[in-house]
Amino acid sequence: TENIASSVQDTGGLYFVPAFSGLAAPHWDQYARGMMIGITGGTSREHIVRAVLESIAFQVYDNAQVMEQDSGYSFSVMKADGGPVVNRFLMQFQADILDAAVDVPVVTEMTAYGAAFLAALAVGEFDSIEDVRGCWKLGKRYEPGMGRMEREFRLEQWHRAVERCKNWEIPNRR
């Protein structure tokens, strides 16, 4: 998907909201439904793939905003892990939308790695959680490069799309 998404300059105005069983945090709407909006005669497979990948970054942005508001802490770096981190397009777009660096570790499956470290800590292989923290190694850092106006426009369009999919399902009407 990385090469497909990178083959077009943008989504051509297409936005994808993956609300297959409603929207979770921070929108909390069980009646929202997934949608793709902005389809035109010029919409291509590449635009669709890119819109789907961008939707992941937009969702992370929305949740990061809530975390910043609730904690009062503004972050300049986000650490990412898991399968999606191998997609360089997605990680760069994530940095652009967050307007923050995104750090990807050498070991991308940190959930399993973390569970192993906690088990090792529990049996005394490490003296403290600080020893475990020292095992995290940076694989790649993605720096934001999108201009403020472009970022704000894309976020505004994303939020318009999210609002349109809310309350779609009418309860007890099937």
Question: Predicted regions span which residues?
Answer:
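Glycine/Thr-rich phosphate-binding loops that ligate phosphate moieties of nucleotide
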Residues: T1-R174
